[in-house]
Design a protein with these regions (language model features):
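Membrane-interfacial loop-to-transmembrane-helix junctions in polytopic alpha-helical membrane proteins
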Residues: 7, 11-14, 18, 81, ...
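Hydrophobic alpha-helical transmembrane segments
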Residues: 10-35, 55-64
Length: 170
């Protein structure tokens, strides 16, 4: 019996909606952040744009390197937390991510807004119930991120449609 069969249809549909939202956040949030900050700054409200620019002022890396550093660090912490054989493993992963994020911001390696983007992406990936789908999303997220960095929204859209064509031919 599926767990969604044991609850009311309204709650089941709400859970499905949350999982679909988590899937899209996992796949597209880092790519959209890079595309908007690199190519489409006019879509950001002026006050928010000033806040993003001022937080990135002291960061020496381009935005793609900054994002890759944080995404790879998050994936390493996630894998490390899974390999610790006890109930304390996930707790160590969360505390490690908090400490690493705080240290990276204080050292001006990454901007605070990027910590928020990577955190939301990581939390959304935990809401995907199937391991193989979650793993696939982790890989495809990097592809969309590179396409967003290279071509903006156009690259993300092209990658999405190519991905749909590949999936429809399976």
């Amino acid at each position: 019996v599926c767990s969604s069969d044991l609850i009311t249809p309204i709650n089941s549909n709400l859970l499905k909606f949350i999982r679909i939202l988590a899937l899209f956040l996992t796949l597209f949030l880092p790519a959209l952040y890079i595309a908007i900050t690199s190519f489409h700054q006019e879509l950001i409200p002026t006050e928010l744009l000033f806040a993003i620019v001022s937080s990135r002022e002291s960061v020496p890396f381009p935005i793609i390197i900054e994002l890759l550093i944080m995404e790879i660090s998050f994936e390493l912490i996630r894998e490390g937390g899974l390999r610790i054989p006890s109930a304390i493993g996930p707790t160590i992963g969360i505390v490690g991510a908090l400490i690493l994020g705080q240290a990276a911001v204080e050292a001006s390696i990454v901007s605070p807004i990027l910590i928020i983007i990577v955190s939301i992406t990581g939390l959304a990936s935990f809401a995907i119930p199937d391991f193989s789908l979650s793993f696939h999303c982790r890989i495809v997220r990097f592809v969309y991120t590179f396409l967003g960095y290279l071509c903006g929204f156009l690259g993300i859209a092209m990658g999405f449609f190519i991905h749909l064509f590949i999936l429809s031919s399976i």
